[in-house]
């Protein structure tokens, strides 16, 4: 049986920008083991060389390193790129991918200056928004049993009926672990920066349309109004059950909590305000990640 998923499937051909770096080397190996079709990488200084990895079956393969995203796409037919370049070079790498019109771009890099991200997003919009960006500062996306574009551990769970979208990487992994026997269509870590490419709403809208996703789990956190906006969207556009969790109930006001975007100012951005908005939209909100997983399990088994 083929499972559906959103944004990423086993058919996607993936390249890695910065493939020769140490982080990229580790995660390229892991992605290949997870079944991802990695077809090459990009590093302008090492164009024309190859990097050697093992494929899923343990056979050694040589992946070509290209001078640009455009060249890599032209030679391999790649339609997904993952950015593993240091923060200083990230903006240029993102712009290069947008110029090449790659359909999906996953930006793992943490610590990209917000003005660089904002510039790149505006640039993408002006270019006609041909590239869906996930991230930055995120674990990426996994469609279990099919493909992994990012750093999410691929062996936690298999394919199943739950769609997960989360601002937090570690809470993504925990939720997948708690519901591992049920499985996931796709799990997306959208990142915790103040400016991100793919939002809760983008993912929820796609899960609503995906025939194999029966239940949606969204994990938010304090700061900003993304969860409140998602609640408004869910109220009018989503027929599937949604379960939510908001990280940061104990956060003091005015202090950034782990993520640059996780900051409470006044009553704006508090976990309580977000929980209230979500519950008003019919979302069942758990007090802890484990309680949230239990709610999801209960609802899924009653469908």
UniProtKB/Swiss-Prot annotation:
It is an enzyme of class 6 (ligase). The keyword Ligase applies. Substrate binds at residue 173. Succinyl-CoA synthetase functions in the citric acid cycle (TCA), coupling the hydrolysis of succinyl-CoA to the synthesis of either ATP or GTP and thus represents the only step of substrate-level phosphorylation in the TCA. The alpha subunit of the enzyme binds the substrates coenzyme A and phosphate, while succinate binding and nucleotide specificity is provided by the beta subunit. GO terms for cellular component: cytosol; peptidoglycan-based cell wall; plasma membrane; succinate-CoA ligase complex (ADP-forming). It catalyses: succinate + ATP + CoA = succinyl-CoA + ADP + phosphate; GTP + succinate + CoA = succinyl-CoA + GDP + phosphate. CoA binds at residues 20-23, 46, 108-110. GO terms for biological process: tricarboxylic acid cycle. It holds the Pfam family CoA_binding. The active site is at 259 (tele-phosphohistidine intermediate). Transmembrane segments: none annotated. GO terms for molecular function: nucleotide binding; succinate-CoA ligase (ADP-forming) activity; succinate-CoA ligase (GDP-forming) activity. Pathway: Carbohydrate metabolism; tricarboxylic acid cycle; succinate from succinyl-CoA (ligase route): step 1/1. Disulfide bonds: none annotated. It comes from Mycobacterium tuberculosis (strain ATCC 25618 / H37Rv). Its EC number is 6.2.1.5. This is Succinate--CoA ligase [ADP-forming] subunit alpha. Keywords: Ligase, Nucleotide-binding, Tricarboxylic acid cycle.
